[in-house]
Amino acid sequence: MIKVLFLFPKSVDLKTVDDLLANQLVPMVKQVQGFRAIQVNDGDIRSPGGPPPYTKVVEISFDSFDEMMEILQSQKSRSANEFLKSLGTLILLYDVREP
């Protein structure tokens, strides 16, 4: 399974992020074959090393790398990605497995 993790910095207005999720990101990824789940943090983000520099965490799961790439290569996704980068969002892509 492939996961995409979005870490939104504290400098970002939460209403902007919530609007992006509700109106663009969630509807877009739910249309992709191989989409499994989308999860968003609920409440404050904590870290044992002190307050983290992020205010919102979003994790999206796909069955495979190819299915994830289908969404990442679309024009809508490219536009959204540029917007996310302009916000200073950290985006991580990674495989997961059972230990």
For the regions a protein language model found, what residue spans apply to each?
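Macromolecular interaction modules
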Residues: 1-99
